[in-house]
Amino acid sequence: METPLDLLKLNLDERVYIKLRGARTLVGTLQAFDSHCNIVLSDAVETIYQLNNEELSESERRCEMVFIRGDTVTLISTPSEDDDGAVEI
């Protein structure tokens, strides 16, 4: 392994967990990526966290295919075995 992107190559066609700026996360199957860390996921679940009046709420949506701009990505990992898209923050 020579670069961090080599880790992504190992996870092509595998489920990945991606944390984005703006209190958003995605779990989906990694289909493609480039050197700017732009990512394409299929069968993705996006979770958006919002803090309203000191109460944390989350909304979820499913996407058949989604493109993620690389400059919004803060973390990429494999999801835990019981991960259904929801994570604790």
UniProtKB/Swiss-Prot annotation:
Predominant cellular place of this UniProt entry's protein: nucleus
Effect in UniProt of substituting N38A: Strongly reduces affinity for poly-U RNA ends
Xref: PROSITE patterns: SM
This protein's record includes keyword Phosphoprotein: no
Matching InterPro entries: Lsm3, LSM_dom_sf, Sm, Sm-like_LSM3, Sm_dom_euk/arc
Keywords: Cytoplasm, mRNA processing, mRNA splicing, Nucleus, Ribonucleoprotein, RNA-binding, rRNA processing, Spliceosome, tRNA processing
The Sm domain, residue ranges: 3-82
SMART domains found in the cross-reference section: Sm
Any Gene Ontology CC annotation: sno(s)RNA-containing ribonucleoprotein complex
Transmembrane segments: none
Protein name (record): LSM complex subunit LSM3
UniProt source species: Saccharomyces cerevisiae (strain ATCC 204508 / S288c)
Lineage, opening ranks: Eukaryota, Fungi, Dikarya, Ascomycota, Saccharomycotina
Protein encoded by which gene: LSM3
